[in-house]
From Swiss-Prot:
Disulfide bonds: none annotated. Keywords: Cytoplasm. Coiled coil: none annotated. It is found in: Cytoplasm. GO terms for cellular component: basolateral plasma membrane; cell-cell junction; cytosol; presynapse. This is PDZ domain-containing protein 11. Residues 49-131 form the PDZ domain.
Length: 142
């Protein structure tokens, strides 16, 4: 004989969902072109080339984080204001795709640092990819 459990005795699971971000307010189509919530300009996310020349003993003007262990790539984590890197257009959140024809998408952090420190002329292919950069920062915060 099956016994039925009263509805009030069920233990319901507790689920925590991420906070919901409300969509932007409706804006007439003719006004959307200049509104940041409706900006669909993707050029900033396209790969670009950065060329830097580093005199002996000089600093690069930027820091990197990540590498093979993070499985997200190498990212620019800081750019020194008014440095050559800053003037060349490097920015925090840029993913380094390659340096001097060396693929940086699956490279150990220490190897990436070695390549950047020893090169006198640096030809970098980067792309602005803030989403993976943010994921990487979240993974490394303790």
């Amino acid at each position: 004989m099956d016994q039925k459990i009263p509805y009030d005795d069920y233990q319901l699971p507790v689920v925590f969902l991420p906070s919901y971000e409300n969509p932007p307010a409706w804006i007439p189509p003719q006004e959307r072109i200049h509104h940041p919530d409706y900006n669909n300009e993707l050029a900033q996310f396209l790969p670009r080339t950065i060329v830097l020349k580093k005199p002996p003993g000089a600093q690069l003007g930027f820091n990197i984080r990540g590498g093979k262990a993070s499985q997200l790539g190498i990212f620019i984590s800081k750019v020194v204001p008014d440095s050559d890197a800053h003037r060349a257009g490097l920015q925090e959140g840029d993913q380094v795709l390659s340096v001097n024809e060396v693929d940086f998408q699956d490279i150990e952090h220490s190897r990436a640092v070695e390549i950047l420190k020893t090169a006198r002329e640096i030809l970098m292919k980067v792309r602005y990819f803030p989403y993976n950069y943010q994921r990487q920062k979240e993974r490394t915060v303790h």
